[in-house]
């Protein structure tokens, strides 16, 4: 089960630099707009201290963490929805992601250029959000035109979708994202195939300076995003690396204090994306390996184990389940079983974060 986080923002705000440090890649991240043209993709581990503790209990030397896919998408500009700055191509890349990581520059630095000549985080957020909204309006209206042709057939499904799309367009034309529209699960299911961008969860990543006096960290930004449904925010400080042309080797020259600070920021970015997607982690554990698996919260166990192998989902019979806390407290399966802490669950069991499972199946 793959989950994609797309880095979105104006050109030259730090997307590629952040991508490099998270993925340990060295894609170009130079100080000029549209340095990135094609989207870059990298897989990053979701660091979880529970893995090491489980491995100690089962005496396993092999640990496999959960992962998230990151996509570094070229910068958007005004008019992107009409194709400005290769906008259509970039917007399609955003549609293919599961969560938007919106990077905003919030600091002054005369050595780092800005595509609009000045640093204004509020304006920059509004530019990107408006382009995404206009793109969704265009997608909805194009679909509505096609549906209108079939409207006379009195097809209930066609009329149902038309009503939902009209509701969406009305909301979008008030410059509001679809995240802030209270669509039902059924309504979302009907239009999900359109991959509407403003319906996706969002994380705002504020690229700040280590020198707080240079930060334009305006309260107005939060006034803009406060109505975003469950929008997450996180700070990063990428100007720590500017002196070395964004090469990942710049990290080696940081002091221990700044290394710890930078590592914490990177970890916060990954977990912000993880939480925005409403994901949880469950585990399989044995001497051969300890493996973390990622699934959407509130799924039945037979649905969740599909990420391990489709056969486990198709032929699911039952699962042996123990919570992480009990597994660690009682030092493994044997003592946990003696104390009645291991449960046998059927396919309608809703898997919980931290569950350690063993599945019985037959195909």
Curated annotation (Swiss-Prot):
CDD domains: TGS_YchF_OLA1 (cd04867), YchF (cd01900). Mg(2+) binds at residues 16, 36. ATP binds at residues 12-17. The keyword Metal-binding applies. GO terms for cellular component: cytoplasm. Residues 3-257 form the OBG-type G domain. Its cofactor is Mg(2+). Keywords: ATP-binding, Magnesium, Metal-binding, Nucleotide-binding. PROSITE patterns: G_OBG (PS51710), TGS (PS51880). Pfam families: MMR_HSR1, YchF-GTPase_C. One of its GO terms (molecular function) is ATP hydrolysis activity. Residues 278-361 form the TGS domain. PANTHER family: OBG GTPASE FAMILY (PTHR23305), OBG-TYPE G DOMAIN-CONTAINING PROTEIN (PTHR23305:SF18). ATPase that binds to both the 70S ribosome and the 50S ribosomal subunit in a nucleotide-independent manner. HAMAP family: YchF_OLA1_ATPase. Belongs to the TRAFAC class OBG-HflX-like GTPase superfamily. OBG GTPase family. YchF/OLA1 subfamily. This is Ribosome-binding ATPase YchF.
């Amino acid at each position: 089960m793959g989950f994609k986080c797309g880095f979105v923002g104006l050109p030259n705000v730090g997307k590629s630099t952040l991508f490099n440090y998270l993925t340990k890649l060295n894609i170009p991240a130079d100080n000029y707009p549209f340095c990135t043209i094609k989207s870059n993709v990298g897989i990053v581990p979701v660091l979880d201290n529970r893995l090491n503790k489980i491995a100690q209990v089962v005496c396993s030397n092999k640990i496999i963490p959960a992962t998230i896919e990151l996509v570094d998408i070229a910068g958007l500009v005004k008019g992107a929805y009409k194709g400005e700055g290769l906008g259509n191509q970039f917007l399609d890349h955003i549609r293919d992601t599961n969560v938007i990581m919106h990077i905003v520059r919030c600091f002054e630095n005369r050595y780092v250029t800005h595509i609009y000549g000045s640093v204004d985080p509020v304006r920059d957020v509004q530019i990107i959000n408006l382009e995404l909204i206009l793109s969704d309006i265009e997608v909805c209206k194009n679909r509505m035109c096609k549906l209108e042709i079939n409207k006379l057939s009195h097809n209930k499904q066609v009329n149902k979708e038309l009503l939902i799309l009209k509701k969406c367009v009305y909301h979008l034309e008030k410059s509001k994202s679809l995240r802030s529209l209270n669509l039902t699960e059924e309504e979302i299911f009907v239009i999900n195939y359109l991959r509407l961008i403003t319906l996706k969860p969002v994380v705002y990543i504020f690229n700040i300076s280590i020198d707080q006096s240079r930060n334009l960290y305006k309260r107005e930004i939060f006034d803009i995003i406060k109505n975003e449904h469950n929008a997450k925010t996180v700070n990063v400080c990428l100007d720590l690396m500017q002196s070395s042309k964004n090469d990942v080797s710049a990290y080696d020259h940081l002091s221990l204090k700044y290394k710890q600070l930078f590592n914490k920021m990177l970890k916060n970015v990954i977990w912000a994306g993880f939480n925005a997607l409403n994901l949880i982690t469950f585990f399989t554990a044995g001497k051969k390996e300890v493996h973390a698996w990622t699934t959407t919260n509130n799924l039945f166990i037979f649905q969740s184990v599909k990420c391990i192998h489709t056969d486990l989902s198709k032929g699911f019979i039952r699962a042996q389940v123990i919570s992480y806390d009990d597994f660690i407290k009682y030092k493994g399966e044997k003592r946990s079983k003696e104390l009645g802490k291991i449960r046998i669950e059927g396919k309608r069991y809703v898997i919980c974060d931290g569950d350690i499972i063993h599945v019985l199946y037959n195909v």
